[in-house]
Amino acid sequence: MSDAIRAFDLVAGTYDDWYNHPQGRQVFDAELNALDLHIPKEGIGLELGAGTGIFAEHLTGAGRTIVCLDPSREMLKKAVERGMASVLGVGDALPLRVGVLDFIYMVTVLEFLDEPVAVLEELRETAKGDAGLTVLFINSESSWGDLYRDIGSKGDPVFKHARLYTMAEVEALITVSGYSVTERVGTLTTKPMETEVGGAITELSSENGVIVLRVHAS
């Protein structure tokens, strides 16, 4: 078990507390809205690194089924408690049948992957040929990136294991993994110290705290 997986196991019981904080709830709503607009309304999807299943639960709807996959047993127990279909596993060796998934998405997962290219290639090879992948990640160049980098350097049990990326770095990973970017948007347009979170979906700028990419196999 990697140190990062062990860290998520240890914080599973309190991981969602941030979303009950007024600012945390606004961040959640902004990210949820961005995801909802950039994954199909129908089909079978996979949330890679689904953790407690909080996003999958809110994104599941009529015609849209989501399977949660995570390597942390303790985090995944929370997803099961939410009633989500859940699979214990890792992204570079998916325990799923090839050609079933209509879409895949990940939320702040790229930052914790030891071998991101291997994972992205596995996703491409496992999903349907026309399936899209949606990647939400922290913008390393933003003030939110500065915040998470700072708390990681100060020993936060989770973010000390994170590797933040710039937009250019993520696009390079996407390209070498056999994908092409078809859409780029951002959200979190305000700084972390502001109580009101800018949750609008915008064209990309250095101020966007998170970036959402929609990509397809080349």
Spans of model-derived segments:
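A conserved beta-strand element that flanks and buttresses the S-adenosyl-L-methionine
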Residues: 105
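Short alpha-helix
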Residues: 161-178, 182-184
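Conserved class I S-adenosyl-L-methionine
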Residues: 1-41, 54-58, 78, 132-161, 194-195, ...
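A short glycine-rich, Lys/Arg-flanked "PGG" loop and its adjoining helix->strand segment in the class I
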Residues: 117-129
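Short catalytic micro-motifs in class I SAM-dependent methyltransferases
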Residues: 108-111
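A C-terminal cap/extension of S-adenosyl-L-methionine-dependent methyltransferases
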Residues: 181-218
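Class I SAM-dependent methyltransferase SAM/SAH-binding core
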Residues: 46, 51-93
